[in-house]
Protein backbone atom coordinates (compact mmCIF):
# COMPACT_ATOMS: atom_id res chain seq x y z
CA UNK A 1 0.00 0.00 0.00
CA UNK A 2 1.36 3.39 -1.03
CA UNK A 3 0.64 6.76 0.54
CA UNK A 4 1.73 10.35 0.09
CA UNK A 5 2.18 10.81 3.85
CA UNK A 6 2.27 8.28 6.68
CA UNK A 7 1.92 9.73 10.18
CA UNK A 8 3.14 7.56 13.05
CA UNK A 9 1.20 8.53 16.17
CA UNK A 10 -2.41 9.65 16.54
CA UNK A 11 -2.01 12.10 19.39
CA UNK A 12 -2.38 15.90 19.12
CA UNK A 13 0.76 16.31 16.99
CA UNK A 14 -0.15 13.42 14.71
CA UNK A 15 -3.69 14.66 14.17
CA UNK A 16 -2.48 18.19 13.42
CA UNK A 17 0.19 16.87 11.03
CA UNK A 18 -2.31 14.79 9.07
CA UNK A 19 -4.75 17.69 8.79
CA UNK A 20 -2.05 20.09 7.65
CA UNK A 21 -0.76 17.61 5.07
CA UNK A 22 -4.31 17.34 3.72
CA UNK A 23 -4.63 21.14 3.54
CA UNK A 24 -1.32 21.33 1.64
CA UNK A 25 -2.59 18.98 -1.05
CA UNK A 26 -1.59 15.46 0.01
CA UNK A 27 -4.42 13.13 -0.99
CA UNK A 28 -3.40 9.74 0.38
CA UNK A 29 -2.62 10.05 4.09
CA UNK A 30 -2.46 7.34 6.76
CA UNK A 31 -2.30 7.65 10.55
CA UNK A 32 -0.87 4.71 12.51
CA UNK A 33 -1.83 4.64 16.19
CA UNK A 34 -0.88 1.87 18.62
CA UNK A 35 -3.69 2.67 21.07
CA UNK A 36 -7.32 1.74 20.52
CA UNK A 37 -8.43 5.32 19.98
CA UNK A 38 -7.04 8.59 18.67
CA UNK A 39 -6.09 11.45 20.98
CA UNK A 40 -2.94 10.21 22.69
CA UNK A 41 -2.15 11.78 26.04
CA UNK A 42 -5.07 14.20 25.69
CA UNK A 43 -7.52 11.44 26.58
CA UNK A 44 -6.28 11.31 30.17
CA UNK A 45 -5.92 15.10 30.58
CA UNK A 46 -9.48 15.73 31.74
CA UNK A 47 -8.68 19.18 33.18
CA UNK A 48 -9.56 22.28 31.18
CA UNK A 49 -7.19 24.85 29.70
CA UNK A 50 -6.82 23.47 26.17
CA UNK A 51 -7.93 25.17 22.96
CA UNK A 52 -7.70 28.81 24.00
CA UNK A 53 -5.32 29.74 21.18
CA UNK A 54 -6.42 27.33 18.46
CA UNK A 55 -10.19 27.16 18.94
CA UNK A 56 -10.71 30.34 21.02
CA UNK A 57 -12.52 28.39 23.73
CA UNK A 58 -11.51 26.52 26.86
CA UNK A 59 -11.67 22.75 26.47
CA UNK A 60 -10.65 19.61 28.32
CA UNK A 61 -8.07 17.32 26.75
CA UNK A 62 -10.63 14.83 25.34
CA UNK A 63 -12.73 17.71 23.97
CA UNK A 64 -9.67 19.21 22.30
CA UNK A 65 -8.78 15.88 20.68
CA UNK A 66 -12.41 15.44 19.65
CA UNK A 67 -12.30 18.68 17.68
CA UNK A 68 -9.40 17.39 15.57
CA UNK A 69 -11.02 13.97 15.14
CA UNK A 70 -14.20 15.65 13.85
CA UNK A 71 -12.12 17.67 11.38
CA UNK A 72 -10.60 14.42 10.09
CA UNK A 73 -14.07 13.25 9.02
CA UNK A 74 -14.10 15.92 6.31
CA UNK A 75 -10.95 14.45 4.74
CA UNK A 76 -9.89 11.16 3.18
CA UNK A 77 -7.26 10.52 5.87
CA UNK A 78 -7.13 6.82 6.74
CA UNK A 79 -6.60 5.64 10.32
CA UNK A 80 -5.29 2.31 11.58
CA UNK A 81 -5.79 1.87 15.33
CA UNK A 82 -4.25 -0.76 17.61
CA UNK A 83 -1.34 -0.89 15.15
CA UNK A 84 2.31 -1.25 16.13
CA UNK A 85 5.13 0.00 13.92
CA UNK A 86 7.90 -2.61 13.91
CA UNK A 87 10.50 -0.99 11.68
CA UNK A 88 11.10 1.93 9.33
CA UNK A 89 13.15 1.32 6.18
CA UNK A 90 14.55 4.77 5.42
CA UNK A 91 16.09 3.87 2.06
CA UNK A 92 12.85 2.51 0.62
CA UNK A 93 10.49 4.84 2.54
CA UNK A 94 8.76 1.76 3.88
CA UNK A 95 7.10 1.07 7.23
CA UNK A 96 6.68 -2.44 8.63
CA UNK A 97 3.65 -2.61 10.93
CA UNK A 98 1.13 -5.09 12.25
CA UNK A 99 -2.21 -5.33 14.02
CA UNK A 100 -4.72 -8.02 14.92
CA UNK A 101 -7.03 -7.36 11.98
CA UNK A 102 -4.71 -6.94 8.97
CA UNK A 103 -1.73 -8.79 10.38
CA UNK A 104 1.71 -7.89 9.01
CA UNK A 105 1.79 -4.92 6.61
CA UNK A 106 4.36 -3.15 4.45
CA UNK A 107 3.38 0.47 3.90
CA UNK A 108 5.18 2.79 1.52
CA UNK A 109 5.08 6.55 2.04
CA UNK A 110 6.63 9.41 0.10
CA UNK A 111 6.94 11.18 3.45
CA UNK A 112 6.94 9.66 6.94
CA UNK A 113 6.13 11.93 9.89
CA UNK A 114 7.03 10.72 13.39
CA UNK A 115 4.71 12.03 16.11
CA UNK A 116 5.18 9.45 18.88
CA UNK A 117 5.27 11.82 21.83
CA UNK A 118 7.83 11.40 24.61
CA UNK A 119 8.78 9.05 27.42
CA UNK A 120 8.65 9.97 31.08
CA UNK A 121 11.72 9.74 33.24
CA UNK A 122 11.43 6.87 35.69
CA UNK A 123 12.79 6.66 39.22
CA UNK A 124 15.94 5.02 37.88
CA UNK A 125 16.46 7.76 35.30
CA UNK A 126 16.56 10.47 37.97
CA UNK A 127 18.54 8.32 40.41
CA UNK A 128 16.34 8.22 43.52
CA UNK A 129 18.14 5.93 45.99
CA UNK A 130 16.64 3.43 48.40
CA UNK A 131 14.41 0.38 48.33
CA UNK A 132 11.79 -0.52 45.73
CA UNK A 133 8.37 -0.73 47.38
CA UNK A 134 5.10 -0.67 45.49
CA UNK A 135 3.36 2.65 44.98
CA UNK A 136 5.92 4.58 42.91
CA UNK A 137 4.28 5.97 39.76
CA UNK A 138 5.26 8.24 36.90
CA UNK A 139 2.97 11.13 36.04
CA UNK A 140 1.35 9.47 33.05
CA UNK A 141 0.75 6.18 34.86
CA UNK A 142 -0.88 7.84 37.87
CA UNK A 143 -2.99 10.08 35.66
CA UNK A 144 -4.19 7.19 33.51
CA UNK A 145 -5.08 5.00 36.49
CA UNK A 146 -7.21 7.75 38.05
CA UNK A 147 -8.73 9.49 35.03
CA UNK A 148 -9.28 6.59 32.61
CA UNK A 149 -9.11 3.28 34.49
CA UNK A 150 -10.91 4.59 37.57
CA UNK A 151 -8.38 3.34 40.15
CA UNK A 152 -7.01 5.39 43.05
CA UNK A 153 -3.25 5.00 43.28
CA UNK A 154 -3.06 5.73 47.01
CA UNK A 155 -4.49 7.44 50.08
CA UNK A 156 -1.40 9.31 51.28
CA UNK A 157 0.57 10.78 48.41
CA UNK A 158 3.81 12.72 47.88
CA UNK A 159 4.47 14.50 44.58
CA UNK A 160 8.03 14.90 43.30
CA UNK A 161 8.27 17.80 40.84
CA UNK A 162 6.22 21.00 40.68
CA UNK A 163 5.56 21.34 36.96
CA UNK A 164 2.01 21.89 35.80
CA UNK A 165 1.23 18.17 35.46
CA UNK A 166 2.45 17.50 39.00
CA UNK A 167 0.32 20.34 40.36
CA UNK A 168 -2.77 19.22 38.44
CA UNK A 169 -2.43 15.62 39.59
CA UNK A 170 -1.95 16.80 43.19
CA UNK A 171 -5.31 18.55 42.93
CA UNK A 172 -6.89 15.54 41.25
CA UNK A 173 -5.70 13.25 44.05
CA UNK A 174 -7.16 15.61 46.64
CA UNK A 175 -10.50 15.72 44.83
CA UNK A 176 -10.57 11.91 44.85
CA UNK A 177 -10.05 11.84 48.62
CA UNK A 178 -6.31 11.28 48.95
CA UNK A 179 -4.16 13.18 51.43
CA UNK A 180 -1.40 14.90 49.46
CA UNK A 181 1.27 15.55 52.08
CA UNK A 182 3.36 17.80 49.85
CA UNK A 183 4.90 18.69 46.54
CA UNK A 184 8.71 18.48 46.50
CA UNK A 185 10.73 20.66 44.10
CA UNK A 186 14.51 20.61 43.68
CA UNK A 187 14.67 24.18 42.33
CA UNK A 188 14.13 27.27 44.52
CA UNK A 189 11.04 28.05 42.44
CA UNK A 190 8.10 26.13 41.02
CA UNK A 191 8.13 25.15 37.36
CA UNK A 192 4.35 25.47 37.11
CA UNK A 193 2.13 28.42 36.26
CA UNK A 194 1.22 30.73 39.14
CA UNK A 195 -2.48 30.07 38.57
CA UNK A 196 -1.89 26.33 38.98
CA UNK A 197 0.08 26.88 42.19
CA UNK A 198 -2.86 28.84 43.59
CA UNK A 199 -5.67 26.64 42.27
CA UNK A 200 -4.00 23.25 42.81
CA UNK A 201 -1.86 23.70 45.93
CA UNK A 202 -2.92 26.77 47.90
CA UNK A 203 -6.66 26.13 47.54
CA UNK A 204 -6.19 22.58 48.86
CA UNK A 205 -3.65 23.38 51.59
CA UNK A 206 -0.94 21.27 49.93
CA UNK A 207 2.54 22.39 51.06
CA UNK A 208 5.22 23.13 48.45
CA UNK A 209 8.77 22.22 49.53
CA UNK A 210 11.11 24.31 47.38
CA UNK A 211 14.85 23.51 47.22
CA UNK A 212 14.05 19.99 48.46
CA UNK A 213 14.56 16.57 46.97
CA UNK A 214 14.01 12.94 47.93
CA UNK A 215 17.09 11.38 49.48
CA UNK A 216 15.85 7.90 50.30
CA UNK A 217 12.91 5.49 50.05
CA UNK A 218 12.87 2.83 52.77
CA UNK A 219 11.14 -0.54 53.16
CA UNK A 220 9.70 -3.23 50.93
CA UNK A 221 5.99 -2.56 51.39
CA UNK A 222 3.61 0.33 50.82
CA UNK A 223 3.32 2.90 53.57
CA UNK A 224 7.08 3.01 54.16
CA UNK A 225 9.12 6.12 55.04
CA UNK A 226 10.29 8.54 52.36
CA UNK A 227 13.03 10.98 53.34
CA UNK A 228 13.34 14.46 51.86
CA UNK A 229 16.12 16.95 52.49
CA UNK A 230 16.61 20.65 51.84
CA UNK A 231 19.34 21.10 49.25
CA UNK A 232 22.75 22.05 50.72
CA UNK A 233 21.44 21.73 54.28
CA UNK A 234 21.45 18.85 56.73
CA UNK A 235 17.72 19.14 57.44
CA UNK A 236 16.36 15.64 56.95
CA UNK A 237 12.60 15.21 57.11
CA UNK A 238 10.71 11.94 57.00
CA UNK A 239 7.35 11.70 55.25
CA UNK A 240 5.50 8.44 55.76
CA UNK A 241 3.57 8.03 52.51
CA UNK A 242 2.23 5.03 50.62
CA UNK A 243 2.39 6.56 47.14
CA UNK A 244 5.05 8.59 45.35
CA UNK A 245 4.31 10.35 42.08
CA UNK A 246 7.31 11.28 39.92
CA UNK A 247 6.59 14.31 37.74
CA UNK A 248 9.98 15.18 36.25
Spell out what each predicted region is:
Residues 1-8, 66-156, 226:
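FAD-binding core/adjacent interface of flavoenzyme oxidoreductases
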Residues 72-99, 174-222, 226:
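A Rossmann-like FAD-binding core segment of flavoenzymes
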Residues 223-248:
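Active-site anion-binding loops
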Residues 50-58, 126-133, 223:
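Short glycine-enriched, charge-decorated loop/helix-capping segments at active-site entrances
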Residues 4, 110, 181, 242-245:
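Conserved acidic residues
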Residues 14, 103-106, 212:
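Ligand-binding pocket scaffold of soluble enzyme catalytic domains
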Residues 3-67, 71, 153-199:
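Beta1-alpha1 glycine-rich phosphate/pyrophosphate-binding loop at the start
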Amino acid sequence: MKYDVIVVGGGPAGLASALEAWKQGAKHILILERDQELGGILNQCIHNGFGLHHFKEELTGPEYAGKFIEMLKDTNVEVLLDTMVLDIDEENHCIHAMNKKQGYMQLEGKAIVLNMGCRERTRGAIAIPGDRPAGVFTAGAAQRYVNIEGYMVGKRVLILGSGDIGLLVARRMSLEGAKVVGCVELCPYSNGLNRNIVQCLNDYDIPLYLSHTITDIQGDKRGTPTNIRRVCENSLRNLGVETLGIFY
